[in-house]
Amino acid sequence: FLLLAMFAVILAACGGSESEDTAAAKPAAAKPAAEKPAAASLTLEEAAAQRAGGPGSFYIGDLSQLVGPAPAPTLGDEDDMVNLAGLERERYLFDSPYYAALVKKANFTNPTKLVYDGDPIEIQFTCINRTVAPCKLVDAVITENIKERTQGKLTLEITSFPELGLAGPDTLALVRDGTIAFTEITSGYVAGDLPQLEITFLYGLFPDHEVEFKVNAAVQGDLDKLIQDDTAGGQVISRMWISGGDNFFFCRDKIETAADFKGKKVRSHGAALSDWIEAFGANAQFVAFAEVYTALERGILDCGVTVAFAAHGQRWYEVTDYMVGPLSSQLINTMVINAKVLADLPEDIRQILVEEGARHELEAMRVTPAWNEVWTQRNIDAGLEYIEFTPEMKEIQLNKAVPIHVLPNWIKRVGGPDTDIVRLFNEKIAPIVGLKINDDGTTTQVPITK
């Protein structure tokens, strides 16, 4: 008996039996599952191979890897594809240091992991107009990719200037004071507020897309700083590169000679463009993009100037009969976010936004080379007669519009030749275009070295 009693005491002390009070206790929590080991970082070549053949593909030496479907209908060629011919024509984009820097910024080999597990965050992004191709590209690419990468923790809600009752010239101020959180900014619209931004929108100065791209790539960092200073810390998240973004005159009456422009009331979307229009004897007028259709329909305007895809998106072919051009342009608008909105984002979400901004730029470079051809044809198919600029018009542009109107008037708007922006022009742009601005505001031809 003594041995049995001692054995019972030992069992009790060791927990070998339970009282009725402890018998129903919850089982111990299961051990957390071990974290999966982090996947080894991809090489850039492996990442490019995985993404080849469609949306999200990028170039590291083989343009054929970019060939494939566009990210959404109407954003590629006539078959909604990205074809090799268009890529080859704009190859300078992909071989540029700027493109290589975007690939690095996009962080394909070691993308930022999602850590944030709080409430979902929604940011409103404001396009100039949601009916035009660049806004559709934003919606199809950066909006969808951010939603997927953050598992819905960050969503971008697309709206537009017309929906918010905006015209565009005060966009920078609205970002500055937080009225707009995240928006598309086109330099021509805000030239009254920050004319320095028009340094890359000096119509007629850049003879082709490649020269204009070199200019844009050379000064984008400087322009980002201007925007940051003007918007109290606003940041450029992405650029809406459109290598198929030539401007055209959509007119009610036929424009066959330079004299036909005289006296015409022409919608302009920027100060430098207005100077170009005035050089031809026409009367430039700023009209909000969403209001141009009605102004053309009622005869308030004789012509409207915009890119082919934008005119088609707004159905200008219903109120005009002629499409005249092209005025060479590689349209580049910026996507700028309010400083506080960006700062308030969790660090991982913020970095994912930056990476997806770079990837959006890469996708824009992939799909837009076809846009001039495809959207010009769509306007023709809608009933417009296409008239190319005559040699006379090109001569007036070269010898009158640019040297007498566009460049001198821009110099005046930025405060004269003794300004930082003119010095930037001479340092970074003059060697590309072969034209230097002198101390008295005149210009001198210089060797093209870049």
Segments and roles (model prediction):
Residues A5-A8:
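Alpha-helical transmembrane segments
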